[in-house]
Amino acid sequence: GIVATARAEALAAQARELLGALERFARSGEFDPARWNATFTIAANDFQRDLLLPALMARLRLSASGLVLRVIPSDVPSLEMLRGEHCQLVISPRPPDGADILQKRLFEDRYRVFYDPAMREPPLTRADYLAAQHITVVYEPRRALDLDRHLAAQGIQRRFAVMVPGFAGLPPFIRGSELLATVPARLQSHLLRDLASVEPPVPCPPMPMYMVWHARHQVDAAHRWLRGELEAVVGDVVT
């Protein structure tokens, strides 16, 4: 058979990109969401997924009923997720760094220490906090939360008894135990609503949240419209 040369493969890739650019240009004019019939994939972990995307879906149903929203886990987002079109948008506190990757900050959260008040007193001092056993979220491959790495860099060493792959795994371990979880405060509005929380007795940085997309979608009218809808949801949900 005929084997494509590297030059031919490069030309084919350029042709695909050109066709994509022409298609996006055709969509960059007037856009009617009511006529949008497509699947839009957003990569988000359970914190931002549960906080934002149900409200986004409810909003989309009003004006873009033909749109299917597909949600996949972002874990630690990679450039390939966006460059390879595995998703059209990422929502994450860790935007991948690339010249062809764009981002916009959606909101900023702060950290609180969650615990079961039936099992322990609040950790009000640094000594209480460091003496306790902790639970945290670790994304594969063993990528700790930015907070955990920040505290370790400050010489604040905690004893981790449990590590789970997502925020949804925290409540079953915290309930009925003396474990502490230092996680985003807005989890208190849904996932951790039945637990108590206090301000961390150690210095914690803020946690920004971004929406991230590939530059190929910057002038796409449909993509731009959906980004605007997400920002509107943030304005309603994040107060």
What are these regions (language model features)?
Residues 35-96, 164:
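Central regulatory/effector-binding core of bacterial HTH transcription factors
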Residues 93, 120-126, 132-154, 219-223, ...:
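Secondary-structure junction motif
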Residues 98-105, 109, 168-218:
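Beta-alpha-beta core module
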Residues 2-34:
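Alpha-helical "hinge/linker" immediately C-terminal to small N-terminal DNA-binding modules
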Residues 75-78, 83-87, 93, 140-198:
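Hydrophobic hinge/microswitch elements
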Residues 50-52, 121, 126, 197-238:
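A late-sequence structural motif
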Residues 33-34, 98-134, 223-224:
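Flexible hinge/capping segments at coil-to-helix
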